[in-house]
């Protein structure tokens, strides 16, 4: 019980840190004129006593911009690179680079140097990227 309580507390502290750092990084992008909405959710994986970070990010730029969809994807990729660098430095997590295959985004996240991926990315719906 104490172990789970400690992990839950650690999860809460880590989530607060992730949220604050994500706020700072997203602010930098918004200062460039991009509209970004996002949510950070951190879950404790009970069986392995590891935590996963789920980021849901929506990037939008002026619809009148030429190739706005491709630009949104690039901004998303840049933003995720910045976030992954922070998480690696702060928590020892490793992110494999995001892979774009047509309209699908794929990201593998590793925690604490593990060779086993514990979160495999997901879905893209228009310019909404979720994982």
Can you name each region flagged by the protein language model?
Residues 16, 76, 87, 118, ...:
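Phenylalanine-focused residue identity feature
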Residues 1-17:
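Sec-dependent bacterial lipoprotein signal peptides
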Residues 16-27:
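Bacterial lipoprotein signal-peptidase II cleavage site
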Residues 33-34, 40-64, 92-131:
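Polar/charged, Gly/Pro-rich intrinsically disordered segments
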